[in-house]
């Protein structure tokens, strides 16, 4: 439910947002009970992630959607442009408001969705926790509305200091735009005497920045971040993806999205561990963690053995009992990178979809197998 390796993260959440932490714990307790029943059913989900759009205005090199090997940029224009309307999304929020899931807004870049701020306001009016994951490039002009909306958490992706960040993100000047946006967020928070949104900086560890992670410490301090998380790189070998395709036949689905993560990490785990220890040895005004939170030996194996799973980690995935991913076309998926769908919110209410025959079938197969091949590099495996 709350893996020991995540205890520190959960502790800080409890201090900052005790109500949120209590709901998370109770939902995970219920999900664990249903998982052990083995009939494929689940209690209400802890969280729903809404992919508001496939569109993105950046081309970050490591991104599985729009990066060098990204899969989304190979899709048709019709696929990329398809989105749920604001009205369809508010109907969805009405449908799930009775059990108050945590809502995450994601993309693509969610702020490219024209009704994003209005949607946040509606989610908060319904009493739900709302978090947004953004590249931060559009924050400056929307900062006032975002703060006024009541957004709980703003997760902003940053890779390093100015020069290196812009190189990785593929757009000169983007770092300064993000910083200007964060400063506007802080300005409106101070003006309105508001504590929220909490600012969480998210740094993906890649071959481009792993030798310079300390640059993020000064950025986090200057921008008054509440937390700084360094995310270990998601990558797969070709052999794992090929094994995953065997399960595609069983599920009558596709793992095409995983193709965007087939590459060599190019990271020296020994040097990365040195950087990690140096960063964690100092005290800061914001929380810092590395996710997944590996030991030194685990970190080495993670980057050198694509099939590696720590012996201390439960070799089972609880995510489809706890999280629903709703894509821009309305499809409700149990996994980020599988095309398998429980149903479509354009056609029937979410609550009818969540425990329907397709959902129970998927969960039953997953429980029988504990994990699928590609799960070894999915961060959701380490979350629950």
Name each model-derived stretch:
Residues 2, 149, 153-316, 322, ...:
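Radical SAM enzyme [4Fe-4S]-AdoMet core and its adjacent flexible, acidic
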Residues 10, 31-32, 38-46, 66, ...:
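Flexible mid-to-C-terminal extensions adjoining Fe-S/redox cofactors in radical SAM and related proteins
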Residues 67, 107, 158, 232, ...:
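Residues that line or immediately flank small-molecule/substrate-binding pockets and catalytic motifs
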Residues 5-153:
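Conserved alpha-helical substructure of the radical SAM core
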Residues 115, 142, 211-212, 282, ...:
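Residue-level recognition of alpha-helix termini/interfacial anchor residues
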Residues 80-87, 172, 176, 207, ...:
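Conserved phosphate-coordination/catalytic loops
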Residues 112-113, 139, 206-209, 343:
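Alpha-helix N-cap/loop-to-helix initiation residues
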């Amino acid at each position: 439910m709350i893996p020991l390796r995540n205890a520190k993260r959960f502790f800080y959440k409890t201090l900052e947002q005790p109500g949120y932490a209590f709901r998370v714990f109770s939902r995970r307790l219920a999900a664990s009970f249903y998982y052990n029943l083995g009939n494929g059913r689940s209690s209400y989900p802890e969280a729903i992630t809404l992919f508001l759009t496939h569109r993105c205005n950046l081309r970050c090199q490591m991104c599985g959607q729009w990066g060098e090997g990204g899969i989304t940029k190979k899709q048709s224009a019709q696929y990329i442009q398809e989105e749920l309307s604001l009205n369809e999304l508010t109907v969805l929020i009405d449908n799930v408001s009775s059990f108050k899931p945590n809502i995450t807004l994601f993309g693509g870049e969610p702020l490219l969705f024209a009704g994003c701020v209005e949607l946040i306001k509606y989610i908060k009016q319904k009493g739900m926790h709302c978090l947004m994951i953004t590249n931060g490039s559009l924050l400056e002009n929307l900062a006032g509305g975002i703060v006024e909306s009541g957004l709980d958490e703003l997760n902003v992706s940053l890779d390093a200091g100015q020069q290196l960040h812009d190189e990785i993100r593929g757009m000169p000047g983007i770092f300064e735009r993000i910083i200007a946006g964060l400063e506007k967020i802080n300005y409106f928070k101070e003006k309105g005497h508001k504590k929220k949104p909490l600012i969480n900086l998210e740094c993906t560890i890649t071959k481009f920045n792993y030798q310079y992670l300390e640059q993020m410490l000064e950025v986090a301090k200057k921008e008054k971040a509440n937390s700084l998380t360094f995310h270990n790189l998601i990558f797969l070998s070709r052999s794992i993806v090929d094994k995953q395709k065997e399960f595609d036949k069983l599920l009558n689905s596709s793992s095409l999205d995983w193709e965007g993560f087939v590459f060599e990490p190019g990271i020296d785990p020994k040097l990365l561990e040195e950087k990690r220890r140096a960063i964690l040895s100092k005290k800061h005004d914001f929380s810092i963690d590395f996710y997944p939170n590996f030991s030194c030996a685990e970190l080495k194996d993670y980057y050198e053995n694509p099939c590696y799973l720590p012996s201390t980690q439960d070799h089972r995935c609880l995510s489809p009992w706890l999280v629903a991913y709703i894509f821009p076309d309305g499809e409700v998926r149990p996994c980020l990178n599988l095309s398998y769908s429980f149903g479509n919110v354009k056609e029937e209410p979410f609550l009818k979809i969540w425990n329907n025959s397709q959902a129970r079938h998927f969960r039953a197969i997953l429980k029988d197998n504990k994990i699928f091949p590609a799960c070894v590099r999915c961060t959701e495996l380490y979350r629950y």
